[in-house]
């Protein structure tokens, strides 16, 4: 029951968003919640790539090291050309939406809002964060969001404190990041979306092309053996064939309308022991003092030598 709460919440947010902007082109990071206990497979692949087949660049910025019980920013960058559009489920052109997933080490989590700085509050305005599940507060999801205004998504992260949690150790930790723009090519059910290039299942000749009332196209193809095959192309992709064209098996019948894609990367952060920092500072101070004393001693010796005429 606990695991259903964030899923239901995500579904509610999506439903409200659809009512506000029905023509949007969604990036669905929360779909993974409904199908996978863990969004990262044993191979290291984030499961969003199972539906978003195109590979695109995703970047991340995190501090090299952080102190215990401190708030820091993990920034996910989802670059693409401004004003890029793609097709929605009804075939119309719409702006790209973006989404992101950040898989933090155990103990790290979304920082409570009362610890956000004014800068973080400004940078996260309009962004809604959800946990992957009730049990996995270290896995955070964002999206869908309007892409042109959210090419950089800031995640406010709270680091754990080994002094209050004995399961946490100081050291280096991995962070797994995924960023998506646009709709996928495969639904979680395994069906293809209209955000695909469609190909001929067999070789033959196009005998007819009929437009459907919802924008789809029904293509009849006759093979050399006389078998007639029907290919239904949903609204959106542009047809590349016409009647009497001969096509080979696997030949494209449409253009590829997809302009989005998914990318992932791994980065690292060090949970730094403040005692080591204090020790390092003390060492630097000691070295600096030693150098100063050596310089003073050298000058003193030079004065004595000068006075003695050496």
Swiss-Prot record:
<keyword id="KW-0813">Transport</keyword>
<keyword id="KW-1133">Transmembrane helix</keyword>
<keyword id="KW-0408">Iron</keyword>
<comment type="similarity">
    <text>Belongs to the cytochrome f family.</text>
</comment>
<dbReference type="InterPro" id="IPR024058">
    <property type="entry name" value="Cyt-f_TM"/>
</dbReference>
<dbReference type="GO" id="GO:0015979">
    <property type="term" value="P:photosynthesis"/>
</dbReference>
<feature type="binding site" description="axial binding residue">
    <location>
        <position position="28"/>
    </location>
    <ligand>
        <name>heme</name>
    </ligand>
</feature>
<feature type="signal peptide">
    <location>
        <begin position="1"/>
        <end position="23"/>
    </location>
</feature>
<feature type="binding site" description="covalent">
    <location>
        <position position="48"/>
    </location>
    <ligand>
        <name>heme</name>
    </ligand>
</feature>
<keyword id="KW-0349">Heme</keyword>
<dbReference type="Pfam" id="PF16639">
    <property type="entry name" value="Apocytochr_F_N"/>
</dbReference>
<dbReference type="GO" id="GO:0005506">
    <property type="term" value="F:iron ion binding"/>
</dbReference>
<dbReference type="GO" id="GO:0031676">
    <property type="term" value="C:plasma membrane-derived thylakoid membrane"/>
</dbReference>
<feature type="binding site" description="axial binding residue">
    <location>
        <position position="52"/>
    </location>
    <ligand>
        <name>heme</name>
    </ligand>
</feature>
<keyword id="KW-0793">Thylakoid</keyword>
<dbReference type="InterPro" id="IPR036826">
    <property type="entry name" value="Cyt_f_lg_dom_sf"/>
</dbReference>
<dbReference type="GO" id="GO:0020037">
    <property type="term" value="F:heme binding"/>
</dbReference>
<keyword id="KW-0812">Transmembrane</keyword>
<comment type="subunit">
    <text>The 4 large subunits of the cytochrome b6-f complex are cytochrome b6, subunit IV (17 kDa polypeptide, PetD), cytochrome f and the Rieske protein, while the 4 small subunits are PetG, PetL, PetM and PetN. The complex functions as a dimer.</text>
</comment>
<comment type="function">
    <text>Component of the cytochrome b6-f complex, which mediates electron transfer between photosystem II (PSII) and photosystem I (PSI), cyclic electron flow around PSI, and state transitions.</text>
</comment>
<dbReference type="InterPro" id="IPR011054">
    <property type="entry name" value="Rudment_hybrid_motif"/>
</dbReference>
<dbReference type="GO" id="GO:0009055">
    <property type="term" value="F:electron transfer activity"/>
</dbReference>
<keyword id="KW-0249">Electron transport</keyword>
<keyword id="KW-0732">Signal</keyword>
<keyword id="KW-0602">Photosynthesis</keyword>
<dbReference type="InterPro" id="IPR002325">
    <property type="entry name" value="Cyt_f"/>
</dbReference>
<dbReference type="Pfam" id="PF01333">
    <property type="entry name" value="Apocytochr_F_C"/>
</dbReference>
<dbReference type="InterPro" id="IPR024094">
    <property type="entry name" value="Cyt_f_lg_dom"/>
</dbReference>
<feature type="binding site" description="covalent">
    <location>
        <position position="51"/>
    </location>
    <ligand>
        <name>heme</name>
    </ligand>
</feature>
<feature type="transmembrane region" description="Helical">
    <location>
        <begin position="277"/>
        <end position="297"/>
    </location>
</feature>
<keyword id="KW-0479">Metal-binding</keyword>
<protein>
    <recommendedName>
        <fullName>Cytochrome f</fullName>
    </recommendedName>
</protein>
<keyword id="KW-0472">Membrane</keyword>
